[in-house]
Amino acid sequence: IKNMDQAQVLKAFESNECDGVALWAPHMFVAANKGAVMAADVRTAGKGNPVVLVADTRYAEKYPDITASFLGVFLRAVDAFKKTPAEDLIAEYQRFYKTFVGKDYDTALALKDLQYHPVFSLEEQLELFDDTGAPSQVQQWQSSVAAFFRDINRITSDEAKKVEDGKYATNTYLKLVK
């Protein structure tokens, strides 16, 4: 097993230098278009890899209303995304991709990418963050991410101990969203 940059992984796959690869968007869609067969993904593996918004703790504690307002704006965008057909988002997504990554994004691949990634409404997020009686789903996901990065030596065991329970993933500010 070799840890490589996604572009290098895709090149190795295209050159038949490997038997299996781990890719994420957009590279997984490019590989699929070139004949790759997906053996598993985050869903079939029973895991999650959510978008994580991180706030500076001191700022968030000092200005909880502003922090919640930011989340409210983000969640309005999520709601708009969920209500808009993916086909109507392609051009804007391609523009974003070109700006962010510096590359063009094929229309069909951009559509697959938009359709593949889940986004969660406020109500869904409150459910995912509910830690009543047990670690929340998000805390479990974050714990799995920490364990993965520890296992491939991207973070040390000491660093992993700081985040391995996922308890930093909290619904405190989500509950303040109006």
Please state what every model-predicted region is.
Residues 138-178:
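Conserved C-terminal helix/tail region of periplasmic/extracytoplasmic solute-binding proteins
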Residues 19, 29, 44-46, 72, ...:
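Residue-level signal for the start and early helices of compact helical domains
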Residues 41, 56, 121, 165-173:
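Helix N-cap / beta->alpha transition motif
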Residues 7-102:
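Pocket-lining segment of extracytoplasmic ligand-binding domains
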Residues 1-5:
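Short beta-strand-to-loop elements that line the ligand-binding cleft
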Residues 62-155:
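Secondary-structure end/capping motifs
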